[in-house]
């Protein structure tokens, strides 16, 4: 892939400070460029195949700026807890223009259904909690995420993209029946998409 003849720097920073034997504070930040975009109709709620395209050469690469901070705690009972808060800014995203089945007379002759995009910016923020037990006959983890994502396009203004799910709960459990036999289960529960 070489549509872009430009060098992009993606610096990243990760720090962890051990406040005590059981408590650690974390900070992560970074820049992330992406050279792919989806070319799917945003009005489709059920999609079996995601169509990905390279960013057109006349568009800059998508940029995400991440910052994540959190605290970790290992209890005397060997149960791990983690709480994180994050914020992400998105620039130069692309959203496929809808209702453009083909070029029409008078339009740009190079415009097709798969290269006509709205310039899109966005942001995302959320809180994540993890509880994890790694030892003993019964072990597993519970994770909960509260997240919000918003995109801005010229025709729609600020809106929630169709993949935005506010609440997600994951539960994984393992039980050792014998030293050689383990049973496991996993359950995921999430709120629905913003549009139905």
Specify the residue positions occupied by each region the protein language model found:
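Outer-membrane beta-barrel proteins
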Residues: 3-6, 34-40, 90-96, 101, ...
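Face-selective signature of the C-terminal outer-membrane beta-barrel domain
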Residues: 1-5, 18, 79-82, 133-134, ...
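Outer-membrane beta-barrel strand-turn architecture
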Residues: 9, 17-21, 63, 73-77, ...
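Signature of Gram-negative outer-membrane beta-barrel scaffolds
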Residues: 1-24, 35-36, 40, 46, ...
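Gram-negative outer-membrane beta-barrel transporters
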Residues: 87-89, 110-195
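Outer-membrane beta-barrel signature, preferentially recognizing the C-terminal barrel domain
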Residues: 32-90, 100-101, 106-134, 165
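Membrane-spanning beta-strand positions in outer-membrane beta-barrel proteins
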Residues: 14, 18, 24-28, 68, ...
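Transmembrane beta-strands of outer-membrane beta-barrel proteins
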Residues: 1, 28-30, 70-72, 82-86, ...
């Amino acid at each position: 892939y070489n549509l872009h003849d430009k060098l992009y720097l993606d610096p990243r920073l990760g720090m962890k400070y051990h406040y005590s034997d059981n408590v650690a504070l974390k900070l992560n930040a970074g820049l992330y460029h992406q050279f792919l975009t989806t070319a799917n109709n945003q009005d489709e709620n059920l999609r079996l195949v995601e169509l990905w395209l390279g960013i057109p050469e006349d568009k800059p690469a998508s940029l995400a700026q991440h910052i994540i901070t959190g605290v970790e705690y290992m209890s005397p009972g060997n149960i791990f807890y983690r709480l994180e808060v994050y914020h992400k800014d998105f620039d130069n995203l692309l959203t496929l223009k809808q209702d453009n089945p083909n070029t029409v007379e008078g339009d740009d002759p190079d415009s097709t259904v798969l290269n006509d995009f709205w310039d899109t910016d966005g942001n995302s923020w959320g809180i994540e909690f993890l509880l994890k037990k790694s030892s003993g006959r019964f072990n597993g983890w519970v994770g909960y995420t509260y997240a919000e994502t918003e995109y801005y396009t010229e025709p729609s203004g600020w809106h929630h993209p169709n993949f935005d799910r506010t609440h997600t709960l994951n539960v994984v459990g393992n039980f050792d029946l014998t030293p050689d036999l383990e049973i496991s289960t996993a359950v995921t529960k999430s709120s629905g998409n913003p549009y139905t």
